[in-house]
Amino acid sequence: MSKIVKVIGREIIDSRGNPTVEAEVHLEGGFVGLAAAPSGASTGSREALELRDGDKSRFMGKGVLKAVDAVNGPIAQAVIGQDAKDQANIDKIMIDLDGTENKSQFGANAILAVSLANAKAAAAAKGMPLYEHIAELNGTPGKFSMPLPMMNIINGGEHADNNVDIQEFMIQPIGAKTLKEAVRIGSEVFHNLAKVLKAKGMSTAVGDEGGYAPNLESNAAALAAIKEAVEQAGYVLGKDVTLAMDCAASEFYNPETGNYELKGEGKTFTSQEFTHYLEDLTRKYPIVSIEDGLNESDWEGFAYQTKVLGEKIQLVGDDLFVTNTKILKEGIEKGIANSILIKFNQIGSLTETLAAIKMAKDAGYTAVISHRSGETEDATIADLAVGTAAGQIKTGSMSRSDRVAKYNQLIRIEEALGNRAPFYGLKEVKGQA
């Protein structure tokens, strides 16, 4: 009943109005899985390749018909007749057939869409929710938890058309006892932040991930505005709500000088100086997690940053590790960071994603499940976070249905699982247990 009988690929539109790949996997017995690949804006140089057509006459070169053709052609031919329940085998067939290190033949967007659609079809054939099937694939059947959200309520960097250099300023509703309560707290802070910004005469237009994107005089000003919003909402910063940042520092690193240039503030830092700039912010505000605090190739700088901050807060590698076990293994051996951001499309298959989560956890690193800035209504990351008991999720702010779809799926899952999926809150964050 779980044999693949048909695979369909199509070009659909993501949350930025760009094309992406959607795949359907059909099984015997009429079971169907549907999934879409997300797309990033600030991308690590060692990510698996997102295949675009380059035909300027369609979607300004961003079409994905080549990737769709790969799904409908060689990928479909290779997986039809295979057992969808054997996820590792399905992924291996596609990866081997592609034959490249970075999935550049078919595109990680093609392989991932089929990989996730296959998992959904297999879950349907087994008569279980996707998160339960993922837990079984993960070797942790029946072990679930609800993730602490990192809610990106001020967007900067590559995610917004403003002067703020740091890409994401996030809140974590640690005072919540449940995921649903965390969503409520996040929503209340989000709406109060709009009032704070309006009172200052600032824009409340939103960026790619649903957070506000005002022009601010400094990164500290963003943190101060959030502090004011938290207090206006009736919460205590540091007790009910903590802060997190994604610097995406590769985006403001100057490779010619080796310096970090905060153009919004008119400041330039060496690698060590920027670490101390961040350290100063953590002294002034309850920041418990910093992602990509340096350029992805500045491993010497990351070793120093981990030495300075790694005992106090969570240091997450995104562009640094790109959900790649080879790179993560090297980072673990060198004591670089203490957490990994998990993005399906950085590596391009569910099996490899699960391997990265396992490697991180086995090494005492945390794993933060994440969306991309270009998303669809696909909410698979919600099931991934619960099914691997990862403990933390980044899926944007409290606006835009491409972000809210994930929160709503988490609410449904929590309702279904009840006390089988505890919400541990701040205990999940490295250095905060």
Curated annotation (Swiss-Prot):
Secreted recorded as keyword: yes
Chief place of localization: cytoplasm
Coiled-coil blocks: none
GO CC entries: cell surface; extracellular region; phosphopyruvate hydratase complex
MF annotations from Gene Ontology: magnesium ion binding; phosphopyruvate hydratase activity
Pathway: Carbohydrate degradation; glycolysis; pyruvate from D-glyceraldehyde 3-phosphate: step 4/5
Subunit (UniProt): Component of the RNA degradosome, a multiprotein complex involved in RNA processing and mRNA degradation.
Residue positions of the active site: 209 (proton donor), 343 (proton acceptor)
Descriptive protein name: Enolase
Annotated compartments: Cytoplasm; Secreted; Cell surface
Alphabetized Pfam families for the sequence: Enolase_C, Enolase_N
Family: Belongs to the enolase family.
Catalyses which reaction(s): (2R)-2-phosphoglycerate = phosphoenolpyruvate + H2O
EC number: 4.2.1.11
Top EC category: lyase
Gene from which this protein is expressed: eno
